[in-house]
């Protein structure tokens, strides 16, 4: 905002998301979670504030000039559009928002995004592909991979066409190089089960008034995972904690749904000490509300 859209966005210095690409993916993954909070906010000013925060977060992700961020945003938009009840209306809205956001970006942003189609002329992209080849060859010759920190001169000398050690810049090739095909299979299977569990929440809690928020959590967790799956294909963030936090939310949500916890919570949830609430508690045979 200070640079009027002409500066590249960077993360906090010295943090895990200091790099523009890492920050962009972290921002993108949080947008659906902000939407979840907005959907269940009770006050209009909170809803408006979260809407503004989502717009600014998307602009910040684009302003990072991360090509992976652009692809991740497109993936999330595709999931939202596919699940939309009115695809024509929502498609137009997404298109207008996308065009308006891109119009805010500087000329060097457009030039950088154009390199997606001309990756053969981009030194950064070719370096990543070389690292991917190294990871593939390493896993092919070592059943359980090379362990952590495989970006060494020795490994690139033996398994890469160009001896230029660098990170894999892909969650998939990162896991492949470090843990082999077995590790990659387990990693993908884990996230597939999380996706299925989130889908279960989306469908099973949809018609339960007390648990409808859980249906929204499942649906929007899938949107976040779609963004991470696409954006993470170009970043070494296989151990980034935010997606695992979503995993925990989905697992806990499924356990909460399975034991129908809202029934128990309705009995134990504290209520304001009012005359009406005391009367309701007495009629229902529940403990009276405690005074503040």
Positions of the model-derived regions?
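Membrane-interface catalytic loops of GT-C/OST-like multi-pass glycosylation enzymes that act
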Residues: 20, 64-68, 166-170, 234-243
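Hydrophobic transmembrane alpha-helices and their immediate junctions
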Residues: 89, 179-225, 245, 250, ...
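Membrane-interfacial segments
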Residues: 5, 39-43, 87, 113-117, ...
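Transmembrane alpha-helices of multi-pass inner-membrane enzymes
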Residues: 91-96, 193, 223-285, 289-292
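A membrane-periplasm/extracellular boundary helix in multi-pass inner-membrane enzymes
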Residues: 1-4, 59-64, 81-123, 133-140, ...
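Alpha-helical transmembrane segments of multi-pass inner-membrane proteins
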Residues: 1-8, 15-83, 91-99, 195-203, ...
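Long extracytoplasmic/lumenal interhelical loops at the membrane interface
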Residues: 6-14, 114-179, 200-215, 220
């Amino acid at each position: 905002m200070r640079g009027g859209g002409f500066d590249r966005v960077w993360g906090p210095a010295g943090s895990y998301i200091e790099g523009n690409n890492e920050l962009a993916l972290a921002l993108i993954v949080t947008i659906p979670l902000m939407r979840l909070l907005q959907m269940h906010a009770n006050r209009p000013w909170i809803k408006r504030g979260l809407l503004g925060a989502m717009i600014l977060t998307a602009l910040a992700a684009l302003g990072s000039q991360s090509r992976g961020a652009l692809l991740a945003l497109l993936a999330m938009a595709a999931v939202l559009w596919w699940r939309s009840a009115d695809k024509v209306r929502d498609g137009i809205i997404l298109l207008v928002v996308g065009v308006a956001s891109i119009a805010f970006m500087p000329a060097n942003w457009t030039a950088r995004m154009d390199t997606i189609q001309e990756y053969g002329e981009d030194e950064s992209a070719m370096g990543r592909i070389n690292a991917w080849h190294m990871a593939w060859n390493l896993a092919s010759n070592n059943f359980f991979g090379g362990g952590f920190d495989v970006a060494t001169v020795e490994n690139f000398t033996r398994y890469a066409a160009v001896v230029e050690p660098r990170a894999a810049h892909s969650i998939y090739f990162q896991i492949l190089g470090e843990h082999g095909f077995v590790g990659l299979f387990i990693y993908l299977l884990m996230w597939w089960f999380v996706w299925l569990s989130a889908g279960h929440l989306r469908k099973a809690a949809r018609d339960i008034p007390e648990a409808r928020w859980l249906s929204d959590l499942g649906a929007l967790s899938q949107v976040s995972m779609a963004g991470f799956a696409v954006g993470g294909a170009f970043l070494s963030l296989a151990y980034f904690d935010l997606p695992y936090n979503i995993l925990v939310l989905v697992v806990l949500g499924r356990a909460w749904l399975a034991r129908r916890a809202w029934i128990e919570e309705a009995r134990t949830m504290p209520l304001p000490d009012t005359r009406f609430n005391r009367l309701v508690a007495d009629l229902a045979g529940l403990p009276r509300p405690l005074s503040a």
